[in-house]
Regions:
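Short strand-loop junctions, especially beta-strand C-caps/beta-turns
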Residues: 23-25, 180-184
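C-terminal outer-membrane beta-barrel translocator/porin domains of Gram-negative envelope proteins
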Residues: 1-125, 129-133, 142, 151-154, ...
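Generic structural signal for short, solvent-exposed loop/turn connectors between secondary structure elements
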Residues: 124-126, 173-175, 187
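Outer-membrane beta-barrel "beta-signal"
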Residues: 166-175, 190-208
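C-terminal structured domain segments
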Residues: 153-182
């Protein structure tokens, strides 16, 4: 199920979007160690159920102010891969901003998690607006790494991560221009400043 009334693909200020996805996966994993490794070749069969729910909505508070919110929850019954790195690359991700969709951050990945945030927006004109986005992310069971680079589940609800972004957006008929600054709780001192021009087009993934 997927529905949307948003007025923009990248920086909406009106409408809502909602998606409920249920998927069943069956596959085969092959692992080939590098030269000099004492680990042998490995082949595993995997099957799991994955459920996810996402919703974002925007509310007009006044002539200039809009308050949006975002929620995503995911549950996957998948087993661990051969090592920690492979496990994290296959784990579900919380990426509510355009910048986070383009980066790989292990701190915001888990097989089961809940993430939510608010999006206060101040409309300067029909073309320009100031936008704040502030999110919290909590894995139900965080994925940890032992001394052998194997994955295991940590204590339930023992980790919390956050990210925030402030941007100035110009919306044009052919795309958007955005100047932004953002911060992630992990890695430490993770600050980014950038300029985005045009549209970022993401196709549907085989594993959502």
């Amino acid at each position: 199920f997927n529905g949307s009334t948003l007025n923009s693909k990248q920086y909406p200020t009106r409408g809502y979007r909602e998606a409920l996805v249920a998927q069943i996966f069956v596959g085969k994993e092959r692992f080939y160690p590098g030269e000099g490794s004492t680990t042998s070749n490995n082949k595993d069969h995997h099957s799991w159920l994955q459920l996810s729910y996402m919703k974002e909505k925007y509310h007009n508070m006044s002539e200039h102010w809009v308050l949006g919110w975002y929620l995503k929850a995911l549950y996957a019954s998948k087993n661990f891969s051969e090592n920690y790195t492979a496990t994290m690359m296959q784990a579900g991700e919380f990426s509510p901003t355009l910048h986070s969709k383009l980066t790989y951050n292990e701190a915001f990945r888990a097989n089961q998690f809940v993430g939510a945030g608010i999006r206060p927006i101040y409309r300067l004109s029909q073309m320009f607006h100031l936008r704040g986005e502030f999110y919290g992310f909590m894995p139900i069971y965080p994925i940890e790494k032992n001394s052998l680079n194997k994955a295991y589940y940590g204590k339930a609800f023992s980790k919390f991560e956050y990210l925030g972004e402030i941007s100035v957006v110009c919306q044009l008929p052919f795309g958007d221009i955005s100047a932004y600054i953002n911060h992630y709780s992990s890695p430490k001192r993770e600050w980014n400043v950038g300029l985005s021009i045009g549209l970022q087009l993401f196709n549907y993934r085989f594993i959502e």
